[in-house]
Amino acid sequence: MAKEIEKPVIIHSRDAAEDTIQILRDFRKENPQIENPGVIHCYSYSPELAKEYVAMGFYIGIGGVVTFKNAKKLVETVAQIPLERILVETDSPYLCPEPNRGKRNDSSQIRYVIDRIADIRGIAPEEVEKQTEMNARKMYRLS
């Protein structure tokens, strides 16, 4: 449907890494002309898999989980993929970032995600804000 109406897809893959990547590999082979095909929402797999998604043109959605102490793979992913392919997300009402973990998540919590990405990458939060806003505008085809 997204292809027919020329909109990006939002992929939420949970415990289905191999199935998801294979479906998207096949899709990209058949549709190489589609720019910015979508986002892998609430990303939770390896940095290597993220790099493959990025190579296919997808954005990687990073939410509150990146602030959790046990999010080692996600921290590695954020450090290794281009900032130009990251979208920040809330996953509201779930997965509220530290220091509010366990509470209801909403868009006011996005600051913690931005700050954590900036910390991981050793850059200013304003740089993360600016780039991820540009990424969202490009991915969602907003002017």
Where are these regions (language model features)?
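Mid-to-C-terminal alpha-helical segments outside catalytic/metal-binding sites
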Residues: 1, 108-143
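Catalytic pocket-lining loop regions of alpha/beta-barrel enzymes
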Residues: 1-87
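Basic side chains
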Residues: 7, 14, 85, 101-104, ...
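Residues that scaffold the ATP/ADP-binding catalytic core of kinase and kinase-like folds
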Residues: 23, 97-98, 139
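Short, glycine- and charge-enriched coil/turn segments that flank and shape catalytic ligand pockets
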Residues: 29-34, 102, 122, 126-127
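Active-site micro-motifs of SAM-dependent methyltransferase domains
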Residues: 60, 94, 138
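Short amphipathic alpha-helix initiation/capping segments at coil-to-helix junctions
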Residues: 67, 103-110
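Short acidic/histidine-rich active-site segments
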Residues: 84-106
